[in-house]
Amino acid sequence: MWLKSLLLCLYSLVLCQVHAAPSSGKQITSKDVDLQKKYEPSPPATHRGIITIEYFDPVSKSMKEADLTFELYGTVVPKTVNNFAMLAHGVKAVIEGKDPNDIHTYSYRKTKINKVYPNKYIQGGVVAPDVGPFTVYGPKFDDENFYLKHDRPERLAMAYFGPDSNTSEFIITTKADGNEELDGKSVVFGQITSGLDQLMDAIQYTETDEYGKPQHELRFLYFVLEILKISNILDLHAAYTEKVEKFRNGDVSVGSTLENIFRNDKAYTPLTTSTGTTAYDLNHPISRALMCLTVLGLCFIAYKGMHEKPHTVSLRHK
């Protein structure tokens, strides 16, 4: 009887594991980005830098780091870029209503990535979790403009909490064909220019709960930022806006592509494949289901063996 009960329990477990396994639908990765597609020209960069993201690798069961280079567009959204750049460097501040000698440094360094939505964006950058919304202008600041569009992957943009409600939080988009649904809501202020494969192939598929909260440590570890000193920046911006108007009027010849953005890193092995989630992780639901099936099969063999009638062979001598 105990074997029958065990078999029933294992059968139920197998059903649960198979039901919990992800579908075999194709995941969107860096390979799905059309590198030849023409986009609006990019503004002249006023800042360049590197963001280091620390994330949990489910294959090696260890923490890894990904370096993403980026550029900021201060000629288009100077106020938004200034807020991001200052928090990347770190600012000293005294919170209103508290001891004026109680000075704290607030920066993006080691802040958590608190939301991850595959094929949409990752979001983080809460610099003062014990205080509340924080910017270099006060708790919040208004939307500057929506001139730059979410027309391509890896846009740097402000996290959306409603009109004119920008805080320190920002997003990095991961949708292969752009997040046009965010146009007119989230202010774009920059672009990731390398490290896109790690972001799109691994980081955006980190394990989360039903609300998009990462199940393992995921954070912006370091920021390195450089202000570019360009003497003719105003002339470059004027030439840029002229090209944008031509592009929006149908002249795609002035557009730019993403062909040179993706870096060629042969040492990096993506965690996902073109057919879906990898299943060689022992904690993966499919792997657990296969192990359950194996145990189920062994139990069945044992059960069958115990109930088979023995075959008696006579060894008597005549």
Curated annotation (Swiss-Prot):
* Annotated GO MF terms: cyclosporin A binding; peptidyl-prolyl cis-trans isomerase activity
SUPFAM superfamilies linked: Cyclophilin-like
Coiled-coil boundaries: none
Q: Where are the transmembrane segments?
A: 286-303
Q: Is-annotated flag, keyword Transmembrane helix?
A: yes
Keywords assigned by UniProt?
Glycoprotein, Isomerase, Membrane, Rotamase, Signal, Transmembrane, Transmembrane helix
Q: Where in the cell is it found?
A: Membrane
- Record field: catalytic activity: [protein]-peptidylproline (omega=180) = [protein]-peptidylproline (omega=0)
Known EC number(s)? 5.2.1.8
Domain annotation PPIase cyclophilin-type: ranges: 55-225
Instruction: Identify the CDD domains for this entry.
Output: cyclophilin
Explain the purpose of this protein: PPIases accelerate the folding of proteins. It catalyzes the cis-trans isomerization of proline imidic peptide bonds in oligopeptides.
Provide the protein name: Peptidyl-prolyl cis-trans isomerase CPR4
- Native source organism of the sequence: Saccharomyces cerevisiae (strain ATCC 204508 / S288c) (Baker's yeast)
